[in-house]
């Protein structure tokens, strides 16, 4: 991890959430409208460059088919995990839970995207300081 920069895992997660929102066919599993901005990409074109670069890095050590499969499986894992967690938080709020602790928060955008839930919670995001700057 570079000093003063988010972890690669946090950035990749944001890239994947943005790519899912912009490019995957409906219905969307998870809609993170802030992911593109959080990923550090200034445009959809910049996102494409970053996603293609990541896929090419995997392809260099494996093969293009495996790289594409990895991209798809990582996307599926990230967006389904995010959706599941937010669904569970919604149910917890309805049961009266008042705290949400996000360990390894990375570039999470929950508090900004979900004010209808966040307004009922004390949210604690815990991660390496560089990721949260």
Range-by-range predicted roles:
Residues 1-101, 107-133:
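Rossmann-like AdoMet
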